[in-house]
Amino acid sequence: MIAVIGNGLVAQQVIEVVKPNSVFNSSNIPELSNTAWDTIYCAAPSGNRIWAQQNPNADRSNVWQIINECAVTKFRRFVLFSSGDTQVKPNTDYGRNRLQLENYAKTLPDSSIIRLPSLIHASITKNILYDIKNNCWLDKINPQSTLQWFDLTCLQSWIYTQHREINVCSEPIETQDIIREFAPHVINELDYTRQGDKYNLSPYSYTREEIFASIKDYLT
């Protein structure tokens, strides 16, 4: 028996691959304990950083709801799709709350933590690639940031990993290089005085060239 927790973009990709018996979200997760599961795939809570930072208590409550329900549920294996922010920005509400869920996963005898960076996918609704494609919020892009990326269509290659913890990341890519390559018309309109986030998690699973090819596919 297979369960998936989550209803976001990553969860939808997991569902397509593992074909779960049941899918749970915040409204029906109390039913999780009604069944003994072989594997629970957790792609929750929401990956919306802005919402999590604006609603830290609600975000924290969502995390603890997952932990508390899993604590009274029988299962053999737990696979958590987490965020690189737990390593790079653990002092933010978003990073701290997801780190709490990682810490729970680490207490389990059979678990994997798969940390994902910024995502490339046709259905993304907010990141710098979405902003470039839709010509919105370009003035909010921080060209001083260095991010790592993952093409979510490749998730199937990682779902069945046996690593206890793994960062699924590309080589670090400076945001201004992405702007220069794909939106050169705004390169001189950006604010270069702000300090940017610097992501450099290892190992690197994808090269800069592979990521640029995925970005090009997304934008064109």
Report each predicted region and the residues it spans.
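Catalytic helix-loop patch of NAD(P)-dependent Rossmann-fold dehydrogenases
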Residues: 57-65, 83-122
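N-terminal Rossmann NAD(P)H-binding glycine-rich loop of SDR-like oxidoreductase domains
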Residues: 1-21
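Rossmann-fold NAD(P)-dependent oxidoreductase module
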Residues: 13-17, 104, 181
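Active-site beta-alpha turn of Rossmann-fold NAD(P)-dependent dehydrogenases/reductases
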Residues: 44, 79-83, 115-117, 169
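NAD(P)-dependent short-chain dehydrogenase/reductase
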Residues: 106-154, 160
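NAD(P)H-binding glycine-rich loop region in Rossmannoid oxidoreductase-like domains
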Residues: 30-73, 83-89
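Mid/C-terminal beta-alpha module of Rossmann-like enzyme folds, strongest
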Residues: 158-220
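Conserved beta-strand elements of the Class I
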Residues: 1-3, 79, 112-114
